[in-house]
Amino acid sequence: MIAATSTMWDVLHWGGETQALIWHPKERRVIAINALGVAPSGATAEFFKSKGMKYPPEFGPLAAVTPGTPGGILVMLAEYGRLSLGEVLAPAIELADGYPMEAQTATLIERNKRKLKEWPDSARVMLPHGSANDDRKGPQAGEIFRQPELAATLRKLVEAEARALKRGASRKQTIMAAYDRFYRGDIATEFAAAVQAQGGLITRDDLANWRVKIEEPRHVSYRGVDVYKLDTWTQGPSMLQALNILENFDLQAMGYNSARYLHTLYQAMNLSFADRDFYYGDPAFAPAEPITGLLSKDYAKARAAQIRDRNDPRIGPGDPYPFQGDSNPFKDLIGAGQGGSAMPAMPAVPAAPVPPNDRPYSPSGVVPTVDSRLPDRSYPLDDAEQAFWRGTTSVIAADAEGWLVSVTPSGGWIPAV
């Protein structure tokens, strides 16, 4: 899987971010990998205000967070893999040296050529026919597509592993030597210099201080089936909330895809999404998400009681705090309803449009406006806010040995439900 992921530059590029759930057969547990990028230390509200921006840009160097995919791949391989980095990256290096471009990717590049032309390095690699007189600038389907700089970087990682092996390092240490070269060595120096030359903010210290986080996943049992999701830095727990709500209904009796069945699914997701948009955020920052209450079966029962035969457009976030023995610190923002319901008493920051993979996101899943409502603050990198990831990965334990893995694309429409 890791070797395949290393070749998927169209959707899992090395400048992007990675999330994963891993089943550990010996320990018989699910492990969560958080390789989400963080905003660079210079990406403060004051900085964007000084540029006359109300929002961080959608594209380009100022939109970039620290790359998480390289670190995520290397840590997963070091901690839980068996192959060497050289073995894993061999197919990726071969493809970077040149391969026949597939039609789908060729079409995607051509469709985005105007955007790619804004950035000289992107245009040089992705638009090899940029000086041609005809309209087409990107590679043709079947044309040999080469990325020599990427191949050179991948070879540097393999070289770092080989040098560490010669020094007598363990398998894990050799792979982490490649990690250090990317985030603290010559690759980091070159990366930061290139970003800054184009007006970006990522520094060498930003890269050096970034870490992959190995976490405990969130978990519920749905009718005896264990379901695992990543934490509230993704929207994954909203699926767990929806399943808890649906457990209060006899879906089988409704009939698969009947009007009542679809209505009930929609309403369960509507309720869980309302909680997601209000309560979810970066777990590294206060206030702590009321995740125990949100995933409580009793809270789900109270939310399920709100589902009626017709859609209720007034549905808002509920109050999960009593279901974990706490009081809600946001009562000034919500008006208490009945049965665990609550309605917004004032508008929150507007929800953001679907972001591209390189767009920084606020931890609550909305893009904050950069105006007087935002504090002027700059975090040390260890505390930097991470982007809110709208894609999500599931591991579903059907029984003692049977597993299902469900993944949906980024975008926030349906979290693998």
Spans of model-derived segments:
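Short glycine-rich loop/turn motifs
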Residues: 17-19, 215-217, 239-240, 390-395, ...
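Noncatalytic scaffold domains of N-terminal-nucleophile
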Residues: 2-177, 182-234, 295
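Generic beta-strand/beta-sheet core signal
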Residues: 205, 210, 223, 228-230, ...
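Internal maturation/activation junctions in enzymes
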Residues: 188, 192, 200, 251-410
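Short alpha-helical scaffolding segments that buttress acidic/His motifs in well-ordered protein cores
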Residues: 1-2, 92, 242, 268-272
